[in-house]
Amino acid sequence: MSTGKIIQVIGAVIDVEFARDNTPKVYDALNVVEAGLVLEVQQQIGDGVVRTIAMGSSDGLRRGMEVKNTNAPISVPVGHGTLGRIMNVLGEPIDEAGPIEYTEKRSIHQAPPAYDELALSTEILETGIKVVDLICPFAKGGKVGLFGGAGVGKTVTMMELINNIAKEHSGYSVFAGVGERTREGNDFYYEMKDSNVLDKVSLVYGQMNEPPGNRLRVALSGLTIAEGFRDEKRDVLMFIDNIYRYTLAGTEVSALLGRMPSAVGYQPTLAAEMGALQERITSTKTGSITSVQAVYVPADDLTDPSPATTFSHLDATIVLSRQIAELGIYPAVDPLDSTSRQLDPLVVGQDHYEIARAVQKVLQRYKELKDIIAILGMDELSDEDKKIVDRARKIQRFLSQPFHVAEVFTGNPGKFVSLKDTVASFKAIVNGEYDHLPEQAFYMVGSIQEAIEKAKTL
């Protein structure tokens, strides 16, 4: 084990000098013995000097401190010992429940599976959320992105997906908290505990208060644990909240490493970093990883380089819209912006496909008519258009749904709606079978039966 010494500290970036013939490799983990800090090598500068990122606070470091090379990348424990535990980026327990028992540790830097090992699946995962199941269904082993600006409900929608899928799902789940609020991580832990599914979940946190090195690598640590379960022939659910903070941590580190920024100040290696993470989140012939990723959209601009780079890696995109949230419709999913590769007659069936498209057609026509209504009022519309507006407003309200995870705030019990009920209900609304009901009856209900019951009380 070769030793070197710190020669420069700039925030989270630390330069370490080793003997020239013992220079550490890129991605090797180094230990600052006195401070108990782990560094990860990012660049070899020359003459035995390496530039590293600190996986923790660099407070108290000084020049001349001794650094040991572990001759291996950062490794985290994988397997059953991680279930029910909260770990940090290094795979160390942070839940004060004793050491983690493990038989294997894996490097957080792995090559993605080879092309001939990949497996495709068209089996649809039922989420119980009407708008998701109808407009952007997702497959087992697929990748789903939840896009939205600040405060439109990404985390709540993700928690509901976890609630509906992970609790019904017999396999294991991995949750990676990347640069999000510690409070949310805490709430999530206790929620899993209360619903008795904690023994099926591994939690890896690198939250907002952590240095950029932790936030940059914590997604990889979580993914390594998920890959471990996948290689045991299991179906794994992988939740990442939030992928944007992974990009942001890369941006913070990139400037300190001396790279020239590219568009909007992002790191020039944005696409490569995103690809390195996303290409590993995939299903093989041994097992599947189904991932749900929250993606923060800066200033509600979907063309920002970070969300735009993420788009290309996903099978389904659920776009949350501020305009819909302002109408009080939650989940605030935009049915015209959200897409899924699974919305194909060969996958979901002709009936489902046609109804989803009919719903989008009605909503699109309503969107076009809004300008006319704003200028001339409803009276100037033809009878046919009036009918479309009426149905569109009912559809819009019926796409809202009370969530189980929001029950404590709203007082409305959460609803799980089966895919069969969802498709049948929207078919009836589009065909005009419920034209006689007031639109308010469709707001915040589960099935169409509840809307009929609600109409009686209005």
Curated annotation (Swiss-Prot):
It comes from the Bacteria. The keyword Glycoprotein does not apply. The keyword RNA-binding does not apply. It catalyses: ATP + H2O + 4 H(+)(in) = ADP + phosphate + 5 H(+)(out). It is found in: Cell inner membrane. ATP binds at G148, G149, A150, G151, V152, G153, K154, T155. GO terms for molecular function: ATP binding; ATP hydrolysis activity; proton-transporting ATP synthase activity, rotational mechanism. PROSITE patterns: ATPASE_ALPHA_BETA. One of its GO terms (cellular component) is proton-transporting ATP synthase complex. Keywords: ATP synthesis, ATP-binding, Cell inner membrane, Cell membrane, CF(1), Hydrogen ion transport, Ion transport, Membrane, Nucleotide-binding, Translocase, Transport. It is a peripheral membrane protein. Pfam families: ATP-synt_ab (PF00006), ATP-synt_ab_N (PF02874), ATP-synt_VA_C (PF22919). SMART domains: AAA (SM00382). Its EC number is 7.1.2.2. Its main location: membrane. F-type ATPases have 2 components, CF(1) - the catalytic core - and CF(0) - the membrane proton channel. CF(1) has five subunits: alpha(3), beta(3), gamma(1), delta(1), epsilon(1). CF(0) has three main subunits: a(1), b(2) and c(9-12). The alpha and beta chains form an alternating ring which encloses part of the gamma chain. CF(1) is attached to CF(0) by a central stalk formed by the gamma and epsilon chains, while a peripheral stalk is formed by the delta and b chains. Belongs to the ATPase alpha/beta chains family. Produces ATP from ADP in the presence of a proton gradient across the membrane. The catalytic sites are hosted primarily by the beta subunits. This is ATP synthase subunit beta. It comes from Francisella tularensis subsp. mediasiatica (strain FSC147). The lineage of its organism: Bacteria, Pseudomonadati, Pseudomonadota, Gammaproteobacteria, Thiotrichales. The gene is atpD.
